[in-house]
């Protein structure tokens, strides 16, 4: 009997030891959840899965609102881990749900569209779709969110509310976030978090700031119409080329002479099209470009239109101006909520170390995450993957690559932010409604 008791005791000790060494959290160990998520994300089970997902999506890039195969693949991964979801939302978008199905609700977002770029990186998983490439890290964003979903689903019994997973189409200029918002993606959601990989931020560090982070963005296109004719007798023409040249130069004054130096704005002409012969003055010239601003966006648009039309008139030409060419609606600035910024900063330091958080500076780049963040409290951040020995190219470059070693950091931050937000919110009490889908 004594021998049996001794063996039973030794067996219990062995089980306890194995349990303590396992990264997967057992019931009753809720306090360890945020601390353990980075360890879990780095485990072969999660890390290998994220790498596989990222490479699969990278090989098959699809443009905005055309992410049919990408969406199908994401849904299959959600099915594998038993996560319920709603589809379609905004044509190809997906909304997944993990947790109680009850308040509070917090959302995590990943974009999934590619860019019309021919990949120049030669490697085993190079894009198989000519002229299309994941050159902005969206394949990594999806992989990180699915990694977080895997971790959260394994610990769903500990969630004090519901995590909403938003897989968004068409971030690159087509305002997919706006369409998802219009189709109810934020129903009952009280806060939303987004992460973007950054080749300019040191590896493993997260950058953010409170307030305006990403500029509002818009586009413009103008057709300047004159009267074409032979280039040898310009006096018999009304030259739209000269008018367009004057317009391009005059637009530069909007920033250098009309903008407070402490208030960043950008107006850039990116295309000038017209004419097809050396000895013919064309009837018209088309110009177009982009504008970025944190404040005074509407006024900047009005001045662009005014300068184009009046400079054209000075040169006896007419001008028509389109401030939403190709359906590209102006995008508001991305503004980080102060309370969420404080939570994010604390989570990053607790999870990755005190030096892991970097105070960012405002970016003139734009993000349609802004449509979510102007509706409910939101927080957008950059996750660094910079490695000077590797020389990672900037976003939107045909040479763009991802440092896959950073994927666990993104998954862990996603999961920890969701758990911590729900924990804090539940402790204060939440009055939101229920999701009909759950």
UniProtKB/Swiss-Prot annotation:
Intervals of motif Prevents secretion from ER: 435-438
Cofactor annotation remark: The Mn(2+) ion enhances activity.
Origin superkingdom: Eukaryota
UniProt binding sites for Mn(2+) 2: 136, 138, 196
Gene3D superfamilies: 3.30.70.360, Zn peptidases
Pfam families, per database record: M20_dimer, Peptidase_M20
UniProt family annotation: Belongs to the peptidase M20 family.
Primary role: Hydrolyzes certain amino acid conjugates of the plant growth regulator indole-3-acetic acid (IAA), including IAA-Ala, IAA-Asn and IAA-Tyr.
UniProt protein name: IAA-amino acid hydrolase ILR1-like 1
Annotated organism of origin: Arabidopsis thaliana
Organismal lineage: Eukaryota, Viridiplantae, Streptophyta, Embryophyta, Tracheophyta
Gene: ILL1
